[in-house]
């Protein structure tokens, strides 16, 4: 006879019903059924607390971090300066023409999600998605004011009283305050945070600031406090996308019914009567803690965000009963299928725990458990390779880029001017981009067309081939440049010429190959 483990404690059954069970499904546009998730305790809940604290801390505090870039640049560590068209990230400064770096980061983010999903399933949804993080934060407030699951259910079902009004007003007021803080933190990324905060308090900030805060306050309050799981189930496309990205070796939260079935609320009596029972005592703890209101025992479901709180709840019950943890666990579908085949004799019989346990109650050697090496399979490595390649490419581009650029635009009307002595002059609009927060002296040189001379409007003439120009820090300096080729030397224009901008101190340089237009048949 299969050995039955000693029961250390009795486990009560929680009154919890899933929102998506077939027996409770109503019309397509049914009124939302409130979910009152019970607080869970365990390793995954602690990890979620850590992720929540880190992500919220980064979001709310980052705009207030200072970073000294000198006297000619803002000192906010992370700043999206739309007015100056700059993006600052600590020691990195991105100009508009370098937006491909931002595009590269978006590509990395996309492949990062593919990588995480392929390796560990919907971990993004369960731990780091903003919707998940803010819902967790709102639930902390709700539990603090109204109590845990049973107390909240009683309060919701009870009649209106002064105590109920007090608790509801306090809860919603804090939720609105969180929404205001969320909207305020967002706009601080687009302006100097201390200055904008002073303007907001003094009520003289730009209207767009108040509008943005209002919109984000409303969305945070509605999504995090009122809609919650409905955002994930009905509004977010990511569950549908991820469904196509998972395979039989992806980690998903799984109810191991090969050891849990048949369920029994009275395992001792059933065993004494010779009945076959599994480890699940049908306590509904996994349903009570689920923020999505589902029963993981019903199998893989679109609503499951793999937050693993049901694992913590079930592990706690197994500890009380003196049984092995892992009745609900992270597992791969391939391992699950193999264990189910073992428990059902290849699918030809009902689940029998004696097929997966020996006479002493221990799991048989054929039972497959999670092997973390499955994470490093070819599909995951390919995603990681693409992700790392893009990352190294961006890093190399950032380290190797010059902070001096030369942009040249040839005059179109007129394309050339014939002077009284027969020489031909072409005009060019030149822009020098000094992409560091320091003033520099740039040497602008013409190379090629040996007989040609160059003149820069408003600048000292120099030797006719080279002009020294002072450029402001972190600015674009526009210049009007005229290049003149004397009569009799027009043949030199066939090869054109080069404009070279160079910083003698850092030896940074940029070169532009320009054409020189001539009148008549000689022009090009």
UniProtKB/Swiss-Prot annotation:
GO BP, sorted A to Z: nitrogen fixation
Residue stretches making up the 4Fe-4S ferredoxin-type domain: 272-299
Sequence positions that bind [4Fe-4S] cluster: 280, 283, 286, 290, 304, 307, 310, 314
Transmembrane spans: 99-119, 173-193, 207-227, 380-400
GO molecular function: 4 iron, 4 sulfur cluster binding; metal ion binding
Principal location: membrane
Alphabetical UniProt keywords: 4Fe-4S, Cell membrane, Electron transport, Iron, Iron-sulfur, Membrane, Metal-binding, Nitrogen fixation, Plasmid, Transmembrane, Transmembrane helix, Transport
Keyword Heme: no
GO CC, one annotated term: plasma membrane
Localisation: Cell membrane
Topology of the protein relative to the lipid bilayer: Multi-pass membrane protein
Stated role: FixG is predicted to be involved in a redox process. The four proteins FixG, FixH, FixI, and FixS may participate in a membrane-bound complex coupling the FixI cation pump with a redox process catalyzed by FixG.
UniProt-recorded name of the protein: Nitrogen fixation protein FixG
Originating organism: Rhizobium meliloti (strain 1021) (Ensifer meliloti)
Protein's gene: fixG
